[in-house]
């Protein structure tokens, strides 16, 4: 058996179905071997960032390990931005790259570099196979480490000569690994006592809580607690319409503290807590608030905050145990107070809905199209089982307040914050859920980072609807320029240099056509609904270039 065969059969043994890649010469052994392993499907991308982004979203939404194969040092360099996002999203990925013949190492070969060192800062483990006899163990370990909590990408370098070496090694079986720890009973009791003594509890959920969505909802209702998501997230854990759900937190300490004003006990579940953009001193939690942190890996427990109680546990196990302990210890007075808190949250939810509908009505006929109108039309047009891949950035608050996501997997965000994720990400989501409609929402600036994804959609016949929110600018940068000038005392009202995407305008319909995808320009509000209906009914990749309002 050759090294390339051990590589391929290791993937199959671990349930891998897709290899996402952009081929190169050093990957020739793998590409050639694919002819002998038809159960592995190669998803071709025209840029390594697209391949890695698609694989990351596939891994996040399928529950399976994503595998990427890219080309030597320049290819890995092209993929590093998406690799950063995958690390932040904790995507279980095995990223591989072909490497030049090891016998050329000292001669400085074309395209050669230290791939292990390049990948190391953005991976859980980075290694190169030096002999074919190492293949079985390295692949077994790579596929395990990628899925060990906290999940994340690993890197394996594949020299072309080692892929062709003979070996007696055979792929190792993954086995059944039971890795979901139960919370310590003493910790559960301590956390329950804090919650039962709270006058205004709140729950903040990270992406790891998605597997415990029902438990989050049940505990929130038991406590009468508001539930917040992190500002940048992959998943929306609770349904949009759940009365306790308060959407996403902002990105600086002062604003987070304001959102959580009055909270005396915060239960933080399955996330790093908190990711900020702007510095401010002090804790994100209100003065005097106590924190309980549930985390599946010790390394992230109490990492950024001092907590009163920390539990290393699978979120589902911890929340189930907490709910039982709270239910057992709740007094009649606590239950009455929790019911009042739930009533108040329900009323606040209704007020928020009315406010958003009024916001949309006020700007319903605006041209360029208002963002609230666009989101309202999307909500009306979406099939009930649709998945939205969101990189709408400044349009995100209107999306969150308007579109009703009923299940945790209905919304997939752009964790990490590096732009260009939605277009390739939607490809991975569609491969993970081929029977569900998938709609990608992307700003115009973000789309241009990974526009080659349209070709992959056409090439593999992936019926994704790509909606480009085209405001002809980097709107988020204009908002952040205002914030910068205010925070650092710079002169205001000096304009926004190099933040407009004009002269020439970006022609997304023309670009899409050149990449094999039909497109339609939407510039008037009345055109939105028929355009969305056409795109969603096309049964093939389709792009809508929607002219929306700019900075407001």
Task: List the predicted regions and their residue ranges.
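N-terminal alpha/beta PP-like core and its mobile active-site loop of ThDP/TPP-dependent enzymes
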Residues: 1-332, 336, 381-384, 463-466, ...
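Thiamine diphosphate
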Residues: 96, 106-111, 222, 257-260, ...
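Hydrophobic, well-ordered secondary-structure segments
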Residues: 277-280, 322-330, 336-356, 423, ...
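Phosphate/pyrophosphate-binding active-site segments
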Residues: 133, 288-392, 491-496, 517-519, ...
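Active-site diphosphate/adenylate-binding microenvironment
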Residues: 4-8, 12-17, 22-25, 30-37, ...
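Active-site/binding-pocket entry motifs
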Residues: 162, 233, 394-396, 550
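Conserved short loop/turn motifs at secondary-structure junctions
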Residues: 206-211, 363, 443-445
């Amino acid at each position: 058996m050759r090294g390339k065969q051990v590589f391929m059969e290791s993937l199959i043994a671990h349930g891998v179905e897709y290899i996402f890649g952009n081929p190169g010469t050093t990957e020739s052994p793998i590409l050639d071997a694919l002819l002998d392993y038809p159960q592995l499907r190669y998803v071709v991308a025209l840029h390594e960032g697209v391949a890695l982004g698609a694989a990351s979203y596939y891994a996040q939404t399928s529950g399976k390990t994503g595998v990427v194969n890219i080309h030597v040092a320049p290819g890995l360099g092209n993929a590093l931005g998406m690799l950063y996002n995958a690390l932040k999203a904790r995507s279980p990925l095995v990223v591989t790259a072909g490497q030049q013949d090891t016998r050329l190492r000292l001669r400085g070969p074309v395209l050669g570099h230290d791939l292990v060192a390049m990948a190391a800062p953005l991976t859980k483990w980075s290694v190169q196979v030096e002999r074919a006899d190492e293949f079985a163990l390295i692949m077994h370990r790579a596929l395990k480490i990628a899925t060990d909590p906290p999940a994340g990408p690993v890197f394996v370098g594949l020299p072309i000569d080692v892929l062709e070496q003979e070996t007696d090694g055979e792929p190792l079986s993954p086995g059944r690994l039971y890795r979901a720890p139960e919370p310590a009973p003493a910790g559960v009791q301590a956390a329950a006592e804090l919650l039962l003594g709270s006058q205004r509890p709140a729950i903040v959920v990270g992406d790891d809580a998605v597997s415990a969505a029902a438990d989050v909802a049940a505990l929130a209702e038991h406590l009468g607690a508001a539930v917040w998501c992190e500002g940048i997230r992959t998943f929306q854990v609770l349904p949009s319409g759940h009365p306790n759900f308060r959407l996403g937190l902002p990105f600086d300490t002062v604003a987070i503290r304001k959102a959580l004003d009055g909270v005396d006990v915060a239960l933080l579940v399955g996330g790093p807590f908190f990711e900020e953009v702007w510095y401010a001193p002090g804790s994100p939690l209100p003065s005097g608030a106590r924190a309980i942190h549930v985390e599946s890996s010790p390394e992230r427990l109490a990492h950024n905050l001092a907590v009163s109680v920390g539990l290393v546990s699978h979120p589902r196990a911890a929340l189930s145990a907490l709910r039982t302990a709270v239910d057992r210890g709740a007094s009649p007075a606590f239950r009455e107070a929790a019911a009042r808190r739930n009533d108040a949250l329900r009323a606040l939810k209704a007020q928020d809905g009315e406010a958003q509908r009024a916001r949309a009505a006020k700007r319903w006929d605006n041209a360029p199209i208002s963002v609230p109108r666009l989101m309202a039309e999307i909500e009306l047009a979406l099939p009930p089982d649709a998945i939205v891949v969101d990189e709408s950035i400044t349009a995100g608050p209107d999306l969150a307040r308007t579109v009703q996501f009923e299940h945790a997997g209905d919304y997939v965000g752009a964790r990490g914050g590096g732009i260009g994720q939605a277009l390739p990400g939607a490809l991975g989501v569609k491969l993970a859920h081929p029977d569900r409609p998938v709609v990608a929402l992307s700003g115009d600036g973000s789309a241009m980072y990974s526009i080659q994804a349209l070709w992959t959609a056409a090439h593999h016949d992936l019926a994704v609807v790509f909606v480009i929110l085209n405001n002809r600018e980097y709107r988020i940068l204009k908002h952040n320029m205002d914030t910068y000038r205010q925070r650092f005392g710079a002169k205001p009202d000096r304009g926004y240099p190099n933040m407009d995407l004009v002269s020439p305008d970006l022609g997304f319909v023309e670009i899409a056509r050149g990449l094999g995808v039909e497109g339609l320009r939407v510039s008037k509000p009345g055109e939105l609904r028929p355009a969305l209906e056409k795109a969603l009914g096309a049964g093939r990749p389709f792009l809508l270039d929607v002219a929306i309002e700019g900075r407001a």
